[in-house]
Amino acid sequence: MESIKTSHKFESILPKQKKFQSILPKPKWLRVKLPTGQKYTELRGLVDKYKLNTICTSGSCPNMGECWGEGTATFMILGNVCTRSCGFCGVKTGRPESLDWSEPEKVARSIKIMNIKHAVITSVDRDDLKDMGSLMWVETIEAIRRMNPKTTLETLIPDFQGIERHIDRLVNAKPEVISHNIETVKRLTRE
């Protein structure tokens, strides 16, 4: 093994070579498995065919192979570019493209093909839209209901900037579960 060459001032902060050899291997439960299997391949094909977004791909989730291998995914609507820049999130930030109004049907069709009994839908924040994307949320829920009447729906929604009429619009669509992540406390959020 080649020695690490350092200047004198850095020697105290760099670990000695012998320490590298004494580091324990990662436990098996911490290792991410490579995505494989028929279900993974089928799901990858659907996502590519219908140009769908999932939080799995957009958020660079390390568990994607495991979830997709079991035939589960969290669909992400309203595009794959968020108008916010949360420090805890891996989704791209910027100026989103215009809405794809065929997205609700594509998501519903994929859920039908996958025979999903419980679908999870999330979205990017769309502060650039007058309705914050609430109409697209309703359109997606209704499309899923039409094509998959027995599928239960879990919605992981943005805050819609706290505008009640947008939140009410989604609540009135009656998904079985409405949830909202609060990822961190204010004192830990970058200003």
List each model region and its residues.
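Flexible, acidic/Gly-rich N-terminal and inter-domain linker regions that tether
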Residues: 1-84
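Conserved Radical SAM active-site core
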Residues: 70-188
